Amino acid sequence: MQLTWLLRITLVFTLLVILMGAYTRLSDAGLGCPDWPGCYGHIKVPTQDHELSHAQSLFPDHDIEPEKAWLEMIHRYIAGGLGLLVLCIWFLCLKTPDAPKKLPLFIVLLILFQGALGMWTVTMKLMPIVVMSHLLGGFSLISLLLLLYLRTRPRRIVASDTSVQNLAPLALVSLFVLIGQIMLGGWTSSNYAALACTALPICEGNWMDNLAIADAFSPFQGQHPSFEFGVLDYHARMTIHIAHRIGAIITASLLLLLAYRLFVSTQLKALSLLLVGLLILQVSLGISNVVMHLPLGIAVSHNGGAALLLLTLVTINYFLWHKSSSTSRV
């Protein structure tokens, strides 16, 4: 019971960290503190006159913006708190005889790597491949925490439900397609391409003749003093944005098909309805981002919607792939 409650708290806290990370990134505060783990050579944001003078001498090329610096440091503080929660979960799993052992250890290693990605995000000046990897690390972390939570709960029998037993492959494909779409979303955001297209449904103008696929999806974009606000030209950013929109159409179609097929199951009908509801919300948020020119609250909510969709699909896959006769734990 203690482990279950700790996992619930940690799941909510992880979602908070993801949303705070999105808020920091979308507020252009990713380099609010140009060093790591401190901020302008201090543990906290420098505010006193002597601290500001020292900070300016260390980073003469940076304009100190306390609001952005505090956003970045708050994100680091709560991420550190999440790390402590994950360590507590690992220790509890080690002490609990029938709890999984390898999965919590992997989660600990993942959050350590996530911390390294957070450092590289700053030291590599918001290099898009690092920023996207950091975003994916957060989504992977919350997904694995949910999986651990599901495995510590009493087992539910779903495999015997013949009406949905053959849907496991479709659910798995849907999960991987959604992950691909989340990657495209992260690539769009990290390359500052969210407003490259302002018309619906695909893009304005003769976009098909102006695609720049090679430039748009090159993981390494050369040497630059900073990648803040993006370094790609308009055509490359437009290509990224279009790929994300087309990916959204494919993903939405597949998830709707999965939800329709799951609706016949008495055990998974609620998850089917939740999936449809979250999908409608996510598409609405995506359209609102375009029409309203990326308002901060809606853009952050779009990140949160992606996380909730991912958690829903992880849960669906767990129940569909779980064999009730299996008693082994990793």
Curated annotation (Swiss-Prot):
Periplasmic membrane side: 24-76, 124-128, 188-245, 292-295
Main location: membrane
One Gene Ontology molecular-function label: oxidoreductase activity, acting on NAD(P)H, heme protein as acceptor
Residues the record lists as binding heme b: H244, H302
Cofactors, names only: heme b
Protein keywords: Cell inner membrane, Cell membrane, Disulfide bond, Heme biosynthesis, Iron, Membrane, Metal-binding, Oxidoreductase, Transmembrane, Transmembrane helix
Bilayer topology annotation: Multi-pass membrane protein
Cellular component GO terms held in the UniProt record: plasma membrane
GO terms of biological process kind: heme A biosynthetic process
Domain writeup: The N-half (TM1-TM4) and C-half (TM5-TM8) domains are connected by an intracellular loop. Each domain is formed from four-helix bundles and they align in a pseudo twofold symmetry manner. The N-half domain is the substrate-heme O binding domain and the C-half domain is the cofactor heme B binding domain.
Protein's recorded name: Heme A synthase
Native source organism of the sequence: Shewanella oneidensis (strain ATCC 700550 / JCM 31522 / CIP 106686 / LMG 19005 / NCIMB 14063 / MR-1)
